[in-house]
């Protein structure tokens, strides 16, 4: 049930499949949840500005049923995204949402 969605203004990200797998493993590790439940998304070429500039930037959404650690996760994911895309951590926003189990569906049911 953990989800990470990375939106970036970059037109493309080299080896995006590898980045998605890295994000998946990192999110499973950070939340302590099985990777079998992790979903990763990468959206490129999103029209975006940050601080009044159209230089490359990213917006990251992380959702989970509990297990969120915003300070540690912000550091880890900014570092990972910066190393793989070249987008400075100072141009990355990370937003977190702790979702109720009854509000998250999968496989025909909700988790709570």
Where are these regions (language model features)?
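Interaction-mediating elements
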Residues: 1-112
């Amino acid at each position: 049930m953990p989800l990470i969605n990375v939106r970036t203004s970059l037109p493309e990200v080299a080896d995006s499949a590898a980045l998605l797998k890295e994000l998946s493993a990192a999110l499973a590790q950070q939340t302590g949840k099985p990777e079998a439940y992790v979903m990763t998304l990468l959206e490129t070429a999103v029209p975006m500005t940050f601080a009044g500039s159209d230089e490359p930037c990213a917006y990251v959404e992380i959702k989970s049923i509990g297990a969120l650690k915003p300070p540690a996760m912000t550091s880890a994911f900014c570092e990972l995204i910066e190393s793989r895309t070249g987008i400075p951590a100072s141009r990355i926003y990370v937003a977190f949402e702790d979702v109720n189990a009854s509000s998250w569906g999968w496989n025909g049911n909700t988790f709570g």
